[in-house]
């Protein structure tokens, strides 16, 4: 139940909603990235949002890449997701220490920064992917996704994302929701929804107390008679492999690869997403260089 997203509707199909509990997923990301509280708060929020966005896809082949770069000390945050809600991601500087806005509330906005953009790339496997970019509004992630949806996709959305880090730096709760109003929404329903969302306690408090996404949905939208359409198991999964890293080395070209062989006689590559190390000895590098030369000779 700790890595679950539910998709549903409410108010007789006037509202679309996604609710996520991603506590274990964010804990896994924290362990892989060895991230500080403020770093995992920023990354965890982005992972949760991207997972829910992936589940909005109408194509099973769609891949989503979210890049948040606000010019802050954390550096760019990159998350990649698919149509099943499976994600992987990293924060460029995971060891940055942050400050609190007030006791118990991390200042994620200052760590992310606001001098930059949120960019969403949706790759459907066609010739050109869809790319949407919008200036960051607060760096707090949820508001930035809401602004992206409103202006890049013309979809008004209420979004809450959160990561609750315990005193021992473990992840106590993580998750969020995306609530979107559909074109047929009545003014009275919209006013009632806005009022409800404005009075909710922080999403991490709700998840820490309730945990089950179905119960969270009823807590948030119970008066709108929500209907659950589907439940998804989501996760942080890195699909890196030696073969993929071989392609990275091949892509640098014969000249640079030869320089590495002559100067270092080995190479070590580290996956950004899971920090797994791949070691290539001189024999392996020479084999890759031969592949490049053979390919060039056949052109």
From Swiss-Prot:
Molecular function in Gene Ontology: protein folding chaperone; unfolded protein binding
Main subcellular localisation: cytoplasm
Keyword annotations from UniProtKB, A to Z: Chaperone, Cytoplasm, Disulfide bond, Redox-active center, Zinc
InterPro entries xrefs: Heat_shock_Hsp33 (IPR000397), Heat_shock_Hsp33_C (IPR016154), Heat_shock_Hsp33_N (IPR016153)
Post-translational note: Under oxidizing conditions two disulfide bonds are formed involving the reactive cysteines. Under reducing conditions zinc is bound to the reactive cysteines and the protein is inactive.
Disulfide linkage: 238-240, 271-274
GO aspect biological process, one term: protein refolding
GO CC term (a single one): cytoplasm
Pfam families cross-referenced by the UniProt entry: HSP33 (PF01430)
CDD domains: Hsp33
Domain of life per record: Bacteria
Subcellular location: Cytoplasm
UniProt key word Endoplasmic reticulum: no
Functional description taken from the UniProt entry: Redox regulated molecular chaperone. Protects both thermally unfolding and oxidatively damaged proteins from irreversible aggregation. Plays an important role in the bacterial defense system toward oxidative stress.
UniProt cross-references to NCBIfam families, sorted A to Z: PRK00114.1
Family, per entry: Belongs to the HSP33 family.
PANTHER family (UniProt xref): 33 KDA CHAPERONIN
Record protein name field: 33 kDa chaperonin
